């Protein structure tokens, strides 16, 4: 009975998303922001430390997280992979076995917390990686931050009990706000991150994210994780945009040393400030 109730909640949210798609089409007739017409009002850092991999997302239709869902058009899914392309070590149906689970999630820029969702448990994980939602919200536990008049970041699927901010609180770039989890509609632990034009998860439109002071590198291990062969289509957009199959990280200190370690050329990174 509980599973039926949860499925009903997911169905209601899906219907709201469909309503949002229709509303945005009516309002804008398909003329939504893209990388040619929109530049972020804020320069964002990645909402985590260390090396993570983009496993979904980009700024073109071919590699978009969910192109037909305007709010999530420029969303990203991030997780951590080892040298074999695995996202876990040990029992693969246990959240704690996954490298990204419990890692700190950080505010991507200065802003104000405008919405927090904290009531979802972690969803179950299957060996087939079928997506489940064990809570009443497909976002799971989430945080919505306003960074500019029409720029809000959404960070979703957070670990139960890990959110350490409250509505109305001012946060700084790089400040811990929660931990990576497996709550909401998800197949395994990861972070869902997007920038949207308003507070609504349903009727806002997604915005391409300009990242600053980060590095990005094509990684061979991604192909071992995902057989969709989308990696080639996201290569030439960095900086400032990242795409599927790239290993990414923040550059906060010792910039040149980190770039050399990653095999990258300093000259390519015009968005890295000295």
Where are these regions (language model features)?
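Generic structural motif
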Residues: 52-54, 105-115
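Cationic-aromatic interfacial patches
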Residues: 1-28
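Zn2+-dependent peptidoglycan hydrolase active-site motif and core
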Residues: 100, 110-159
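Short hydrophobic beta/alpha edge segments that flank linear recognition/processing sites
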Residues: 172-184
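Short histidine-centered loop motifs in beta-beta connectors
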Residues: 151-174
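Acidic, glycine-rich catalytic/binding loops that coordinate metals and/or anionic ligands
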Residues: 194-274
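N-terminal accessory interaction module
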Residues: 1-5, 26-27, 41, 52, ...
């Amino acid at each position: 009975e509980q599973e039926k109730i949860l499925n009903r909640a997911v169905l209601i949210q899906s219907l709201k998303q469909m309503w949002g798609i229709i509303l945005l089409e009516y309002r804008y007739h398909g003329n939504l922001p893209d990388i040619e017409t929109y530049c972020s009002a804020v320069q964002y850092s990645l909402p985590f430390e260390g090396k993570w991999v983009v496993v979904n997302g980009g700024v073109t239709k071919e590699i978009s997280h969910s192109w037909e869902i305007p709010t999530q058009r420029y969303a990203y899914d991030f997780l951590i992979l080892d040298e074999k392309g695995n996202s876990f070590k040990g029992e693969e149906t246990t959240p704690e076995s996954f490298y990204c689970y419990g890692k700190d999630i950080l505010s991507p820029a200065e802003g104000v917390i405008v919405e927090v969702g904290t009531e979802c448990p972690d969803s179950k994980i299957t060996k087939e990686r079928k997506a489940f939602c064990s809570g009443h919200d497909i976002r799971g536990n989430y945080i919505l931050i306003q960074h500019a008049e029409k720029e809000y970041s959404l960070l979703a699927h957070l670990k139960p009990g890990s959110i350490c901010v409250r509505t109305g609180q001012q946060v700084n770039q790089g400040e811990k706000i929660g931990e990576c989890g497996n709550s909401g509609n998800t197949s395994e632990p990861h972070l869902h991150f997007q920038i949207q034009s308003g507070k609504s998860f349903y009727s806002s439109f997604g915005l391409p994210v300009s990242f600053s002071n980060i590095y990005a590198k094509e990684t061979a291990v991604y192909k071992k994780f995902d057989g969709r062969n989308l990696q080639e289509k996201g290569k030439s957009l960095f900086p400032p945009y990242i795409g599927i199959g790239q290993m990414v990280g923040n550059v906060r200190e010792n910039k040149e040393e980190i770039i050399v370690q990653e095999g990258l050329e300093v000259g390519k990174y015009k968005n890295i400030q000295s």
